[in-house]
């Protein structure tokens, strides 16, 4: 493994070497048995528990640096690791270990009139480059998911989480070695220089097969603009909740507060609340009061001043903002049609929820909104691969090609065709 180097070193040469090693490791990993990959992941989970004190000490360094730089509380929350979060990380990896191995699965098969038997079979993608920012848990999730799917991975975390990610990466390597798999199958970029990102986006001389960016709008935009390899885009989570006139108020209140306030700094946190104008008198005040009581700042459109005066006014900028904080924008809309219109204008195509009891309203919401995840009578905070039973996720893909929604093990595979004959030649 490459050791940490100074930024003044030749970043391009370092990255090309990482790419070469990843490509070499991808070949044996692609044919590794399900049992060996399972053993590696179980060993990783064990290492996380055994090294928890080291990981927390490394995280303390990152947190100290972050606080000195004056970052927002939401950023600190995303960066923070605790004993509980490390246990959750380990449990998530154990869950990934127990998933069915996708590699070699026959997705479909059929016979042709000429006697050929055709199978479509899952295969690893190859080498995946993951570029992310302040969440150190992505190091564990991405490494484990790529390993389960038989892919080598190059991890480029943000400089803010460097010490935490490096400590977690050591656990991943320990698991690989324990199972007799190549240590270079999971590599971490050892330089903070942003030129490393640019090098990854070139594909490292054909070594990288796909890039997964996980971070803010500027990072994802850069990746999409500069990448010379396919990208699974994880855009911002500008998530909406629409509360219909038919909604159960008690249920709506519980869901809205959870969707916004459970963890404000995750991409599945609700950022805009849309309320059916036809039930404003019944719904608006109790929903807003519940949010305020939970410690949330409410920014409301002008028409809500008659229902609940004294709220901060919302602007068009608010409808386009992923706060990742205890702030929500609220608007009255003309029923389901108004909700659909607003969401289709402002959504990032990540996650939207509807709270309603009228089936026809729900079906319109599901059919006319084209976001990756749509929920009915459930919190947007369920937009998570672990909650979907995937064991974890490498991100929420908001594009429409190949992977969409939570990118789990299955989405990190491609396929090939196996055609079996008995001597056929084409006339």
UniProtKB/Swiss-Prot annotation:
One Gene Ontology term from the biological process aspect of the record: L-proline biosynthetic process
Pathway: Amino-acid biosynthesis; L-proline biosynthesis; L-glutamate 5-semialdehyde from L-glutamate: step 2/2
One GO molecular-function entry: NADP binding
Function description: Catalyzes the NADPH-dependent reduction of L-glutamate 5-phosphate into L-glutamate 5-semialdehyde and phosphate. The product spontaneously undergoes cyclization to form 1-pyrroline-5-carboxylate.
Places the protein is found: Cytoplasm
NCBIfam families listed in its UniProt record: PRK00197.1, proA
InterPro entries associated with the record: Ald_DH/histidinol_DH (IPR016161), Ald_DH_C (IPR016163), Ald_DH_N (IPR016162), Aldehyde_DH_dom (IPR015590), G-glutamylP_reductase_CS (IPR020593), Glu-5-SA_DH (IPR012134), GPR_dom (IPR000965)
Keywords: Amino-acid biosynthesis, Cytoplasm, NADP, Oxidoreductase, Proline biosynthesis
Family the entry assigns: Belongs to the gamma-glutamyl phosphate reductase family.
Gene3D superfamilies hit by this protein: Aldehyde Dehydrogenase, Chain A, domain 1 (3.40.605.10), Aldehyde Dehydrogenase, Chain A, domain 2 (3.40.309.10)
Protein name (record): Gamma-glutamyl phosphate reductase
Pfam families the UniProt entry points to: Aldedh
Catalysis: reaction(s): L-glutamate 5-semialdehyde + phosphate + NADP(+) = L-glutamyl 5-phosphate + NADPH + H(+)
Keyword Amino-acid biosynthesis attached: yes
Assigned GO CC terms: cytoplasm
Xref: CDD domains: ALDH_F18-19_ProA-GPR
Class of enzymatic activity (EC top level): oxidoreductase
Disulfide bonds: none
EC number: 1.2.1.41
Organism annotation: Sinorhizobium medicae (strain WSM419) (Ensifer medicae)
Protein origin, superkingdom: Bacteria
